[in-house]
Amino acid sequence: MNKDKKCSFLKGFTLVEMLVAVSIFVILVFSVLAVLIAGQRVWNDGETQMDIQFEARRIMQRMSEELTYANPDNITISDTQDAITFVVPSSYNYTTGNIEWGNQIQYFLGGVNGHTLLRREGANTVVIGRNVSSVRFTLNGDRVGIQLVLSKQSPSRNNLQVELNSQVSLRN
């Protein structure tokens, strides 16, 4: 065999072919990475949205259950409509047929930044919920309207918000 003849089967990649292949690979990797990052952001936003929806429902249920037992004559709503004060029955006297009323209960916004919903009964104040942007109470006859807005920033820096509205029928 003649050593001067080059074997046709020993051909390799040229530099240009290698650069094109690497460029296509890099574009593909960055495309997949962009899709994964977008998916993670959507996941984080969805998870944060579910968290504040759950929190809003929990807060609304707690207030609604307690307000159900209030008497419309014993309800006071602040001028700014962001606080409500009421009393609920503590017991019923079967002998006299009278309802014995308990301590005053108040729901209001407070905390360090004003985004914490608090419940005060007597000298005890407890946190009902956090991330509360606004709460609004209205009284119409024997119904209390509650508008509750919660907001929270997701890990991907999106501000998410949930608004719940409820009408509570008063029993007493």
Model-based region annotation:
Residues 1-13:
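N-terminal leader/signal peptides at the extreme start of proteins
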Residues 156-162:
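Beta-sandwich strand segments
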Residues 92, 150-154, 168-172:
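Beta-strand elements of well-folded, non-transmembrane domains
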Residues 13-68:
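Aliphatic-rich helix starts adjacent to a transmembrane/signal segment
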Residues 142-150:
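A short hydrophobic beta-strand element
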Residues 76-143, 161:
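Type IV pilin-like appendage domain
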